[in-house]
Amino acid sequence: MAAPRSRRCSLSLLTLFSITLILISVSLFVSTKPANKPFLDYRNQFSISISISSPLEQNTTNTSFVSASPPLSPLGQSNTTNTILASSSSSSSFSDHQNQNKSPSPTSKKIVIRKRSGLDKIESDLAKARAAIKKAASTQNYVSSLYKNPAAFHQSHTEMMNRFKVWTYTEGEVPLFHDGPVNDIYGIEGQFMDEMCVDGPKSRSRFRADRPENAHVFFIPFSVAKVIHFVYKPITSVEGFSRARLHRLIEDYVDVVATKHPYWNRSQGGDHFMVSCHDWAPDVIDGNPKLFEKFIRGLCNANTSEGFRPNVDVSIPEIYLPKGKLGPSFLGKSPRVRSILAFFAGRSHGEIRKILFQHWKEMDNEVQVYDRLPPGKDYTKTMGMSKFCLCPSGWEVASPREVEAIYAGCVPVIISDNYSLPFSDVLNWDSFSIQIPVSRIKEIKTILQSVSLVRYLKMYKRVLEVKQHFVLNRPAKPYDVMHMMLHSIWLRRLNLRLGT
C-alpha cells in the first residue's frame, strides 16, 4: 500500500538533508588537506622511483629523484607538472572535471623505493676517502722526508684499510689462473695471488670483497710465469718467442669475464688489474692496446721506454724469495763497521752492467765490483759491510738488488734509465737512495765520496725506516710490501670516477 503523501515528502526532505551533509563533509576534507606536506623524503639513503599509471590506458611515467633532490610534493599539486606526469581518463565529463580538482586516488599510483646502486655507494665511499686525504694533506702533522706527503700517505693508507675491497674473478683454472710462482725472482706474483685468491689462516685477506658488487677493483688472476712454463716451454725456434699465444689467452679471459659480468665494460677495464714480475708481463696488452687502454698492470719491469704508464700502471719491487723464506736476511749493521764504500756482484746481463764492468770490475778496493765473488767472500756479509750497494739494471730495468740493499741497511745506488721506481707515488726515493745515470757510471766513486757523513747517516736511517714497506708478510700486515702494492692500486682507483 502506498505511503501517505505527507510521509513521502518527509522522507524526501530527510534524504536531501543527508546528501547535503555528505557533500559538505567531502568539501571540508578536500579543502583542509595540507598542500605542502612532503610525500616521501628519503634524501639521505635512497633514490625514489615513482610510477603512475592510468587504469584504462596503462600508460606509465617514471620519475627518479636523486638524493640531492628536495622533498617530494603531493602528487596532485599543479606545480609538479614538470616532475611527475599523471595520466587518467574517463567517459564522463563530470569525472574529467573532478580529476582536475583533486589528487589522484591512492590506487592509481605505484610507489617503488629502491636503494642506491652498488656503484653509487662505492663512488660515495671513495669521495669520502678523497676528502679525508685532502684534509690530512693540508694539516701536515707528520715531519719526514721519507714520503712525498707523509700526512696524505698515512691518511690514505688508513682509508684503504677501512674501505678498500678487491674482487678476484673466479673464472679460469689452475695452473694458468689462480696460481703463480711463490719463490725466486718471480715469487711476488704467486704470493700476491695466494693472498687474494686462497682461503686459509695465512691467506685470507681483509681486502677481499664478499661479493663483486661491493668491490672497488677487480683482480685478474692471470699468471704470466705459469703461461710461459706450461704453454711456451720448451721454446725450440725463434717463432716460439711470439707473444701471440699470450695475447690470445689474456684477451679470451677478458672476453669471458666481460660477457659474464658488467664490471669490465662499466669502466672499460679501468678498475681491473693484474700483477706479474715476469719479463714478458708488460707485453700482455700489446695484442689489443685499445682493449687494455685503461687496464692497470702491476709490473716489476716498469720501463717507461717500453710502454709503462706511471699514471695507469703500478711499479712493484722485484724480491728474490728463497724456497721456504719470505725474503733476504736482515742485516742492520752499524755505519761504523761499514768499511766498503760501494759493492756489486752479479752477472754481466745487459748493456748497463757491461759498462759498469768496463770501468770498475775488480779495479778498486773502495768500489768493489765482481761478476764472480773471490773465494772466501760472502755476498750477504759483504753487503752488510758496505755503505752503498750498486743496483744496476740487468736485462730489464728491475732488479732484486734494491730490496736486497734495503734489507742489508745499505744505501741503494740505482743505475738505470727509464725505471719508474716502486711506490714512487708516495716514497721520496731521493731521501734514501742515490740515482746515477748510465752516462756517469765512470764517476761512481767521485759521486759517492762527495756524500757528506751527515747526509749519509740520514740516508742510512731512512733506509732502515723504509724497509718495512719492502717486507713480505703472510698474512699481509699494514704498511708491508703487500699493502703497498694494494695502496698503489687504491690510488689509481681514487683517481677514477665512474657513473658521474
UniProtKB/Swiss-Prot annotation:
Glycans are attached at N59, N62, N79, N265, N303, N418. Disruption phenotype: Decreased cell wall xylose. Residues 62-110 are annotated as: Disordered. Its EC number is 2.4.2.41. It is an enzyme of class 2 (transferase). Induction: Up-regulated by biotic and abiotic stresses and senescence. Down-regulated by cytokinin and nematodes or Agrobacterium infection. Residues 31-500 are lumenal. Its main location: Golgi. One of its GO terms (cellular component) is endosome. One of its GO terms (molecular function) is xylogalacturonan beta-1,3-xylosyltransferase activity. It is a single-pass type II membrane protein. Highly expressed in adult leaves. Lower levels in young leaves, stems and roots. It catalyses: Transfers a xylosyl residue from UDP-D-xylose to a D-galactose residue in xylogalacturonan, forming a beta-1,3-D-xylosyl-D-galactose linkage. Residues 75-86, 96-108 have a biased composition (Polar residues). The chain crosses the membrane at residues 10-30. It is found in: Golgi apparatus membrane. GO terms for biological process: cell wall organization; pectin biosynthetic process; protein glycosylation; xylogalacturonan metabolic process. Keywords: Cell wall biogenesis/degradation, Glycoprotein, Glycosyltransferase, Golgi apparatus, Membrane, Signal-anchor, Transferase, Transmembrane, Transmembrane helix. Belongs to the glycosyltransferase 47 family. Involved in pectin biosynthesis. Catalyzes the transfer of xylose from UDP-xylose onto oligogalacturonides and endogenous acceptors. PANTHER family: EXOSTOSIN HEPARAN SULFATE GLYCOSYLTRANSFERASE -RELATED, XYLOGALACTURONAN BETA-1,3-XYLOSYLTRANSFERASE. This is Xylogalacturonan beta-1,3-xylosyltransferase.
